[in-house]
């Protein structure tokens, strides 16, 4: 079976030199760049020989005929889905395998009929798909169609001026500056054109450009307050609140203050004052800064740094206990390492054996009175040596428990990684996980005293008002609350 011909003749009709799949028994899977090459040779129309441009070696391929033929085979709905899949693949949002799977679903014939004609139809779709991808790839390596009169419909999925569904545009004969700008804008991708439209709308309606790059640049530039109201200017002069030139100098003095990372020390009072005055001027505050504000900021900085050091110490202690040894409760109810508890038990056992040995020695001493003096001297020496050894072990243990541990930069880094709310402006978000709060439904105690309400229903009051204000007693209020909180 020969290839499906184009439904309507076009001024520039492309030729497909590749043989049909039926004649060559060749099948190409969608998404594979293995199809025959598409020729860029075009036959000019006899009626427009004068206006047709000569086809050079870098001439772009007219994809309009292939697109129309593929649209007629797929249908409008399938073509829309196919164009979306190809666009996602070209943008890199679909892999080659995903493209093949999606196109298999689009090109698959209906489940009701699986005849030979449907197989040939599928082969024709695969052939046109491969030729279309090769044509798009070939056009991407050739000159831009903008500026020419004949092939403006060869790019995009039928968005050119030669598409019969689109309104024909008038061609201006004179090459004006506006037309040049228009062609440059139209050559940009769709996302960039939409960004230009948004900038134009925001600049015209709101009077300000809400562009992220522009806003970032404005945030980095120091802001100097300017007085535009005459009354405010009089008040500034009368109160001797300086001039815009002096305000700009205050801002520059704030920027010139050395940072703590440069001086390797906490800022002093003068540095705090200059920095606070500069920030106040940038935000339009032209008054004076009280010295007590500087003291408050200094205390806040000290407390902030102390909190970081405190969290770091707790983290180091926790990691040392967690990864060094297992801990358990001792006889006194205090947490102690398992190795130390085993050592204590071993020492106690050794002490018990020593006591038993001493008792046996005392019994032998009673039997031999003559040798008692010598043995007593030896015992005194042994006792004194054992007491000295135990005292030394106690001192070493005390020094081991009270030894000084230095914090390193790695410890600070680990602490800030575990508690990012210490340095990031998201403390309320990260600190919620450390508060231990529970939901309201988890706060209800199902084993409370209110469960004994059915046992005392006979003592329930009648809720009769004592006066016209309908105010009951405290006892009635308690029963009312119990009735509200319990189910009937």
Swiss-Prot record:
Keywords assigned by UniProt, alphabetized: Nucleus, Transcription, Transcription regulation
Polar residues: compositionally biased ranges: 37-58
Nucleus found in the keyword field: yes
Chain positions covered by the region annotation Disordered: 1-58, 352-383
Localization: Nucleus
Coiled-coil segments: none
Superkingdom to which the source organism belongs: Eukaryota
Any one annotated GO CC term: SLIK (SAGA-like) complex
An annotated Gene Ontology molecular function: transcription coactivator activity
UniProt entry tagged with the keyword Repressor: no
GO terms of biological process kind: chromatin organization; regulation of transcription by RNA polymerase II; transcription by RNA polymerase II
Note: Present with 7950 molecules/cell in log phase SD medium.
Function, in words: Component of the transcription coactivator SAGA complex. SAGA acts as a general cofactor required for essentially all RNA polymerase II transcription. At the promoters, SAGA is required for transcription pre-initiation complex (PIC) recruitment. It influences RNA polymerase II transcriptional activity through different activities such as TBP interaction (via core/TAF module) and promoter selectivity, interaction with transcription activators (via Tra1/SPT module), and chromatin modification through histone acetylation (via HAT module) and deubiquitination (via DUB module).
Subunit structure: Component of the 1.8 MDa SAGA (Spt-Ada-Gcn5 acetyltransferase) complex, which is composed of 19 subunits TRA1, SPT7, TAF5, NGG1/ADA3, SGF73, SPT20/ADA5, SPT8, TAF12, TAF6, HFI1/ADA1, UBP8, GCN5, ADA2, SPT3, SGF29, TAF10, TAF9, SGF11 and SUS1.
PANTHER family: TRANSCRIPTIONAL ADAPTER 1
Annotated protein name in UniProt: SAGA complex subunit HFI1
Species the sequence originates in: Saccharomyces cerevisiae (strain ATCC 204508 / S288c)
